[in-house]
UniProtKB/Swiss-Prot annotation:
Family: Belongs to the adenoviridae E19 family.
Disulphide linkage map: C37-C55, C49-C111
Lumenal face residues: 20-136
Topology in the lipid bilayer: Single-pass type I membrane protein
A single MF term (Gene Ontology): D-mannose binding
Domain notes: The lumenal domain binds directly to the peptide-binding domain of class I molecules.
Signal peptide positions (record): 1-19
Any Pfam family the entry gives: Adeno_GP19K
Positions on the Cytoplasmic side per record topology: 158-172
Protein name in UniProt: Early E3 18.5 kDa glycoprotein
Annotated Gene Ontology cellular component terms: host cell endoplasmic reticulum membrane; membrane
Membrane-traversing stretches: 137-157
């Protein structure tokens, strides 16, 4: 009995026993849902609508295809009337198999809404008046954010307790 225990101990120390088995790494591509993508819309020109499609940052083998453009994980494309209202998401598994999902989305309604909202608030198409307003607003917001950061850094430096080594040694 003692000899068997010695042999098992030596096998486990040498890595030949079952005590040294490593669990398989979890592949995020196995759980990836090709239909769970994020779409963002913005006016690109007076007629085109910019579309940003993001899918699966955890899985590197995701390919998105729309209007003959293919890219990994994020695809920036444009939509206009006549362009297909679907995009394809394909995920390559660890065994080489490919899962494909053809997603149909209401590009026309979302782009119409984005264009309508930008036109309603005179944000699109750009004009001299709103470009100047945007530039001034951008400069003001940048100055405010910079001031907030400077105040925070100043407060961090001023409020931080300054204890010398002698004071630390006197503490109980």
């Amino acid at each position: 009995m003692g000899a068997i225990l010695v042999v098992l101990a030596l096998l486990s120390l040498l890595g030949l026993g079952s005590a040294n088995l490593n669990p398989l790494d979890h592949d995020p591509c196995l759980d990836f849902d090709p239909e769970n993508c994020t779409l963002t819309f913005a006016p690109d020109t007076s007629r085109l609508c910019g579309v940003l499609i993001k899918c699966g940052w955890d899985c590197r083998s995701v390919e998105i295809t729309h209007n003959n453009k293919t890219w990994n994980n994020t695809l920036s494309t444009t939509w206009e009337p006549g362009v297909p209202q679907w995009y394809t998401v394909s995920v390559r598994g660890p065994d080489g198999s490919i899962r494909i999902s053809n997603n149909t989305f209401i590009f026309s309604e979302m782009c119409d809404l984005a264009m309508f909202m930008s036109r309603q608030y005179d944000l699109w198409p750009p004009s001299k008046e709103n470009i100047v307003a945007f530039s001034i607003a951008y400069c003001l917001v940048t100055c405010i954010i910079t001031a907030i950061i400077c105040v925070c850094i100043h407060l961090l430096i001023v409020i931080r307790p300054r204890q010398s080594n002698e004071e630390k040694e006197k503490m109980p």
